[in-house]
UniProtKB/Swiss-Prot annotation:
Chain's role: Catalyzes the formation of phosphatidylethanolamine (PtdEtn) from phosphatidylserine (PtdSer).
GO MF, any single term: phosphatidylserine decarboxylase activity
Gene transcribed to yield this protein: psd
Cofactor(s) this protein cannot do without: pyruvate
Active site (catalytic residues): 90, 147, 252
Annotated organism of origin: Pseudomonas entomophila (strain L48)
Residues bearing the modification Pyruvic acid (Ser): 252
Site residues (Cleavage (non-hydrolytic)), renumbered to this chain: 251-252
Record's comment on post-translational modification: Is synthesized initially as an inactive proenzyme. Formation of the active enzyme involves a self-maturation process in which the active site pyruvoyl group is generated from an internal serine residue via an autocatalytic post-translational modification. Two non-identical subunits are generated from the proenzyme in this reaction, and the pyruvate is formed at the N-terminus of the alpha chain, which is derived from the carboxyl end of the proenzyme.
Membrane topology: Peripheral membrane protein
The name this protein goes by in its record: Phosphatidylserine decarboxylase proenzyme
InterPro entries xrefs: PS_Dcarbxylase, PSD-B, PSD_type1_pro
NCBIfam families with a match to the protein in the record: PS_decarb
Cellular compartment(s): Cell membrane
Family to which this protein belongs: Belongs to the phosphatidylserine decarboxylase family. PSD-B subfamily. Prokaryotic type I sub-subfamily.
Length: 287
């Protein structure tokens, strides 16, 4: 009954209004408020500040600065296995596996369209049909920067407007097409394993999504917008394996997609597996 009421509330609540209000709270610089709220949050979610570059909670100018905190050098060593594809973020594996008939598995019989996830462009989605996906959920206590699984050159970024349902196990099991309905940013790279998509999915009270090349990704009008980076007039944007790609200001989910016969997921991973950025996520499926 409790879960059902929660799901009903997800359809009734004003997602974007609540998220804008949360964004204002998270950017508040009043010392008495930001210090008290940050301390409460760190204690409530048992945030490990010993690995943070700045351990003093009161040193952060606002809550968002704390939430997107940098880590000390070496806190997330990169797996050195030759050809390893790295986990892009701290969190837990929600699901991973093949993209079958253009569908990505969500939970308990729910799936969603890879085409819709990527913004509805058949040409952009085509290389991933029959490929592989991995969905990583970032919890409140996690490090909320997203990094490159492989070295890649940015080809395209797509902002896809949408709802802002909460993202957790309950909504994954009860909200159809959850990740293809929520607001998201699709980042498409060319890599040694072919096209790679990293999708940053928003959620309720996720105030914003940033990338290292574009900053805050919030078009003036909430409509689908494509940014191309492979034009001759632009200097190429190349990111090395393990380099920061973007960050969540109040996190959510990162989804990584590869084409067919390109990667094989690490045998130790499955739904529910705890992961850290820089650990092995997959290996090449072929030499």
């Amino acid at each position: 009954m409790k879960s059902r009421l929660f799901i009903i509330s997800q359809y009734l609540l004003p997602h974007h209004l609540l998220s804008r209000l949360a964004g204002c709270v998270a950017e508040c610089r009043a010392r008495w408020f930001k210090n008290a709220f940050t301390a409460w949050f760190a204690k409530r979610y048992q945030v490990n500040m010993s690995e943070a570059l700045v351990e003093d909670l009161s040193a952060y100018e606002h809550f968002n600065a704390f939430f997107t905190r940098a880590l000390k050098p070496g806190a997330r060593p990169l797996d050195e296995t030759p050809g390893a594809i790295l986990c892009p973020a701290d969190g837990a594996v929600s699901q991973l596996g093949p993209i079958e008939h253009g569908r990505i598995f969500q939970a308990k019989g729910h799936g969603y369209s890879a085409l819709e996830l990527l913004g509805g462009d058949p040409a952009l989605a085509a290389p991933f049909m029959g490929g592989e996906f991995a969905t990583i959920y970032l919890s409140p206590k996690d490090y909320h920067r997203v990094h490159m699984p492989l070295a890649g050159t940015l080809r395209e970024m797509v902002y896809v407007p949408g709802r802002l349902f909460s993202v957790n196990q309950t909504t994954a099991e009860n909200v159809p097409e959850l990740f293809a309905r929520n607001e998201r940013v699709v980042c498409l790279f060319d890599t040694e394993r072919g096209p790679m998509a990293v999708v940053l999915v928003g959620a309720m009270i996720v105030a914003s999504i940033e990338t290292v090349w574009a900053g805050l990704v919030t078009p003036p009008k909430r409509e689908l917008k494509t940014f191309r980076y492979d034009e001759a007039s632009r200097a190429p944007i190349h990111l090395e394996k393990g380099a920061e790609l973007g960050r969540f200001k109040l996190g959510s989910t990162a989804i990584v997609l590869f084409g067919p016969e390109q990667v094989k997921w690490a045998e130790s991973l499955g739904a529910g597996s705890a992961v850290r950025m820089g650990e092995m996520l997959a290996v090449p499926a072929q030499a």
